[in-house]
């Protein structure tokens, strides 16, 4: 029920995603998909791709539409947001956007207390360590899923086991890497028409280089399909190059919870969607919870999705919300009969988040006004009527009014349009059940 277009729209326009999307490298989309295609080909044909086949896949991925890459990046950022501890999310955004010096960003550990792993594609059978994903996503470094041992955390990192701050992660370079880099530099210098500077140009020095180049070609075979120049070029290209397909970064200025204005000195905001992550995280520590793909291929079918994290665990199971929130949903402009009747995606999002954000006014419209993040542990939803995060993808069937005491026991998996309006009808056997009925 969480895979509706309206729900995905809210995921894609979350302030966390809006602020980080311009800093994601477009190369990450090509790299993750290329590794998945190679793995799928090997499983199907029991042999590796040829260079021509792999090069064709690479060219296909590089020429993909920008909106496809941005949609993938938005979903992956939403997935990563769940795995970052709530108290570290704001620091992570500010450090990536350059508004704050880099500090440790701790992730939620798995059941063994180690770094979690997630899948980066729909219905993927390979999982990647979170720190590897961060390095590929924000630095554009082509790392394999088995390169976790090559990552080295910075000395100022207070928790090297769980820190996923990209600025605290370096890739260790071995002697072989330096050896290969020497020949790459020499070959580029020989092919360049400009005179060589900084390197001896005597004939006695050039002869050994020619011999070494021959030995290099005999000793090493390039397994990838990226040239050096192409690899550097694509790894520096951001996934957002100007105006995106569904929104403009200029239009988002002033509506983000994470202020993109460098002159802003402080932030006062609330994150109601993150308040329940700390209380629910102990339930999902295994690797199976990382792979949140459904049979249809959507990411956010689990109860840990960003749009559903503002409800408690009983509502995640039963698909219901409190009467107060339902009353506010009825008053909300988002509660339209159909997605076609609603406003465009950007205007819907900005109107949706405007009551929550008080970056420019300096006033936090929250039950707990504070300059720092506040994560209540006693209650996930406010006890009074509120307009925080009304979930427009969840509506009651017409035959259930907002005051029906049994609405939390009714499954919303069925299409509400199939229900016939009429007076409330109660079944005799179902009020005693504590789990939803899926028939």
Swiss-Prot record:
Q: Tell me the Pfam families matching this sequence.
A: CTF_NFI (PF00859), MH1 (PF03165), NfI_DNAbd_pre-N (PF10524)
Q: Where is the composition biased (Low complexity)?
A: 301-310
Name its cellular compartments: Nucleus
Q: Which residues bind DNA?
A: 1-195
Main location as per UniProt: nucleus
**Protein's GO biological process:** DNA replication; positive regulation of DNA-templated transcription; regulation of transcription by RNA polymerase II
Residue ranges for motif 9aaTAD? 404-412
Q: Please note every region of biased composition (Polar residues).
A: 333-349
Its keywords, alphabetically, are: Activator, DNA replication, DNA-binding, Nucleus, Transcription, Transcription regulation
Keyword Nucleus (UniProt) = yes
Q: Which PROSITE patterns match?
A: CTF_NFI_1 (PS00349), CTF_NFI_2 (PS51080)
Its Gene Ontology cellular component terms are: nucleus
One of the entry's Gene Ontology molecular-function terms is: DNA-binding transcription factor activity, RNA polymerase II-specific
Region annotated Disordered sits at: 191-214, 260-349, 415-439
What's the domain of life for this entry? Eukaryota
Q: How does it assemble?
A: Binds DNA as a homodimer.
Q: Show the domain comment.
A: The 9aaTAD motif is a transactivation domain present in a large number of yeast and animal transcription factors.
Q: What protein family is recorded?
A: Belongs to the CTF/NF-I family.
**Function of the protein:** Recognizes and binds the palindromic sequence 5'-TTGGCNNNNNGCCAA-3' present in viral and cellular promoters and in the origin of replication of adenovirus type 2. These proteins are individually capable of activating transcription and replication.
Q: This chain belongs to which protein, by name?
A: Nuclear factor 1 C-type
Q: Organism source for this protein?
A: Gallus gallus
Name of the coding gene: NFIC
